[in-house]
Amino acid sequence: MSNINLVQLVRDSLFTIGCPPSIITDLDSHSAITISLDSMPAINIALVNEQVMLWANFDAPSDVKLQSSAYNILNLMLMNFSYSINELVELHRSDEYLQLRVVIKDDYVHDGIVFAEILHEFYQRMEILNEVL
């Protein structure tokens, strides 16, 4: 897995999605790569323990909102995400945010076209969570 060129993978996937080269700034594989979005939290991409991880931080909802949204959140969490090592997205909570996270299977991190599909599917999950919250 250490042979992954994360910068090139992300760059290729962004070109595949249709991002103009002029808006893709210098990418650095020594820290998380952040894809800023207009109306959603940023998508972060990094190598963690030699595995590609994607995550997005949402503002932490109140306990009441979280409880009232539990059914919809559970449905989101149980949706198949076939690119993930456990075929699911994960949700982690802190005082400051809810983090939607996925660790990608090694088979899918060598092709920009496939990684573009992963980014798109992850973004769709972000949209669902954003609507629920």
Curated annotation (Swiss-Prot):
Keywords: Chaperone, Plasmid, Virulence. It comes from the Bacteria. CDD domains: T3SC_IB_Spa15-like. SUPFAM superfamilies: Type III secretory system chaperone-like (SSF69635). Pfam families: Invas_SpaK. InterPro entries: Invas_SpaK. Homodimer. Belongs to the SpaK family. Required for surface presentation of invasion plasmid antigens. Chaperone specialized in the storage of effectors within the bacterial cytoplasm, maintaining them in a secretion-competent state, and allowing their immediate delivery to target cells upon contact of the bacterium with the host cells. This is Surface presentation of antigens protein SpaK. It comes from Shigella sonnei.
